[in-house]
Amino acid sequence: YVHTNEEARDYKVLRCKTNQIDKLEVFIPAKKETVIGGFEFLDDYILRSEKSDAIPKLFVRNIKTNKEEEIKISDEPIGVPGVSLMQRDTNTTMIRVGWESMATPGQVYEYDIVSKQKKLVKQTEVPSGHDSANYVVERIKAKSHDGQMIPISLVRLKTAKQDGKSKILLYAYGAYKHSISPSFSASRFCLIDRGITFAIAHVRGGGDLGDRHHEKGKKKFKKNTFLDYIACAKHLIEQRYTYKGGICFYGGSAGGLTGGAVANMAPDLFFGMLLLVPFVDTMTTMLNEKLPLTPGEWEMWGNPIKSKEYFEYILSYAPYNNPVSYTHLTLPTIAEV
């Protein structure tokens, strides 16, 4: 079995008989906006992962019948599954599957592939106490400026009303093909328990929907990242999860660049910006080739030293070069020295 991205930007799986590498055939084909992940083997089954529509999934395939099914551990719409083959014996139908979501801390189940029976064997404890049943996890989509649908993952109190009166902490990153998993973080719940919704905008530039999702959010397409985020913010307002001026941006480093850019482009949507070591002086950094990290960063942002086009493009969005009035915004930042 061969896991490859040759002529398949988001990978595919090929197979051949032993010593017949020249006779490879497609086993798992490439799929649009789906990242085909790795796989594990039992004697009679193949376990594999993929991320489709920014949602991680696990599948099991019977080698003899070639029938494949998704392993569903939870009724929650989105989460982060994982498989671990703890035992040396591969002649088994019993595996261990991990699960967590934005509402549920990490769990480990024993799962029987044939019977589909599961048994909880480990539950991550939250010292302050936590009941996942008190919360709801949702997945919605916003239409960006060019028609691209951008996923939004969110978690909130089950008792929270969708009446356009709640505040939202809306996270984004959008760079380096880095995917943001809809995973659990106990620290968020001090806000969620106060009625604030936590959401993730899976904007372009990251890798949530595969390589094309990344490519359309870098270099000359970088503004797609910011426009995607603004589209997500407006959609949350339209769907009455929040209201205009009820959103706080949250992000760091390259995500801080996203925050700085959207603060300049649509300041009226936000009441605050939580920026962690934000990359807001983009132009000055990209012009200084003596900085050790700058040459490697040109692959993400473009080289403004050699290209007038990139110089003008970066200058048009770099937060430090495009300030507006922030009198109504709270702008805490955290910087490393």
Residue locations for each model-derived region?
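Structured, non-catalytic alpha/beta "coupling" segments that mediate domain-domain communication
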Residues: 10, 94-117
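Structural motif
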Residues: 8-14, 54-59, 104-109
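Single conserved hydrophobic/aromatic residue that forms the stacking wall/gate
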Residues: 328-337
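Cap/lid segment of the alpha/beta-hydrolase catalytic domain
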Residues: 124-239, 243-245, 252
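Beta-strand C-termini and the immediately following turn/loop, strongest in propeller blades
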Residues: 1-7, 45-54, 96-102
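Multi-bladed beta-propeller domains
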Residues: 17-40, 64-85, 114-134
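Active-site-proximal cap/loop segments of hydrolase catalytic domains
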Residues: 200-329
